[in-house]
Amino acid sequence: PSRLNPGDTYRLVFETSISTAATSTDINFYNTFVNDFANNASFNPVLASLGTTWTAIASTAAVDAQDNTGTNLTTDGAGVSIYHLNDQIVATGNADLWDGSIANLIRSETGGFDAAPVVWTGSTAAGVESIGLGLGRIN
């Protein structure tokens, strides 16, 4: 991101432009989906070139999104700034990510918005499972 200095740490966030059924109760299913997508050069060669491990902003009955992504203010600390791939800041840290209001909407890896009005993550704006509505709970 252009606002950072060499050596600064940060996170990137994007919405996949393809979807998967939210029927699995295993958070690793969603992490694998997002990781395989991000590291597939046919979808986005720049993302794939980063060669990093990606996790889903998703909650199941067993795992909350803030824990799955290492952005839990209590256990992971203040965190770092989070940016969209187009250089827009999304959140200034873990507290900002989960305070119910992010600076910019999360876009797809192409920079656009999904035509669907809502992306189901099974999570509340606080990054915890939406009680009874976590991924894999509704078929």
Region locations from a protein language model:
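Secreted/extracellular ectodomain signature
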Residues: 1-139
